[in-house]
Amino acid sequence: MAWFAANIPDGSVQVVFHPASFGKHGHFGGDDASRAAAFVEYANDPRLDAVWFARGGYGSCRIAEAVLPRLTAVARKKRYLGYSDAGSILAMLYKAGFPHVAHGPMSSDSVRNDATAWRAINWLRSGDPSSWEPSLATDPRPAVGFNLSILDALVGT
């Protein structure tokens, strides 16, 4: 939160962490039901413009199928950004036709104090194409990025 306060002092971007983000359940960030409920709550909240995954999403594959049927039209309008195991949820959203899904930096990466956090914020705010992989700007084909281990698990190789 300090990075956001220091770098966006006008408050034009506000970051809200769901209380479940700080949960503990074994090596997971909370039990599956709590994590699924938190994701659905924020995805369906019309006051929020985007969902930016906080960390790697370890265990997101365990909740991905449970959350999809609970997402509303509000959730479909949001932008979603994350990487690593969060790719399980990103893949599910992409497959379901959610138009604004990207594999990229997480909010926890902002502490690196480099351009990646700014590119992520600009994409989350407006879909700014300068934040994309450069080849995507001229290639009209759909493109999806994944952690290779997650992609391997998703396709079953």
Can you annotate each of these PLM segments?
Residues 98-156:
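Conserved anion/nucleotide-ligand pocket segment
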Residues 63-64, 92-95, 113-115:
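Short acidic, glycine/serine/threonine-rich loops at helix termini
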